[in-house]
From Swiss-Prot:
Name under which the protein is recorded: NADH-ubiquinone oxidoreductase chain 3
Enzyme class: translocase
Family: Belongs to the complex I subunit 3 family.
EC number: 7.1.1.2
GO molecular function: NADH dehydrogenase (ubiquinone) activity
Keyword Transmembrane helix: yes
Transmembrane segments: 11-31, 63-83, 90-110
GO CC annotations, alphabetized: mitochondrial membrane; NADH dehydrogenase complex
Annotated compartments: Mitochondrion membrane
Catalytic activity: a ubiquinone + NADH + 5 H(+)(in) = a ubiquinol + NAD(+) + 4 H(+)(out)
Length: 121
């Protein structure tokens, strides 16, 4: 148990300091900045123009689909980057497990493309 704590103590200290610092900055900004909401601050901003319509209008479902697809393939990169850093040190099982992961994601991407999820009509 002591060996594990020794190895991860730097990460734990970094996490604690960053959490404390971000909390202090957030609380200071909340208490020190005057809170005076007016009509201009609470209205929707449309690139300098007056809003044409209500800002609470519904979005097209394609925006959500694009956001979900972005998250999926962004997470793929978060798994792929550490794997590429330790590629020379891992065994053949680690290599082929990532290849299987990439093949599954590629098949999913081809399926989405075939079904027209990426088309904007």
């Amino acid at each position: 148990m002591k060996l594990i704590f020794t190895e991860y103590s730097a990460i734990l200290i970094f996490f604690a300091i960053s959490s404390l610092l971000s909390s202090v900055i957030f609380l200071l900004s909340y208490f020190l900045i005057p809170q005076k909401p007016d009509q201009e601050k609470v209205s929707a901003y449309e690139c300098g123009f007056n809003p044409f319509d209500d800002a609470r209008a519904t979005f097209d479902i394609r925006f959500y689909l694009v956001a979900i697809l972005f998250l999926i393939f962004d997470l793929e990169i978060s798994f792929l980057f550490p794997w590429s850093l330790v590629l020379g040190e891992i065994s053949i099982i680690g290599f082929w497990s990532m290849i299987v992961f990439l093949v599954i994601l590629t098949i999913g991407f081809i399926y989405e493309w075939y079904k027209g999820a990426l088309e904007w009509e």
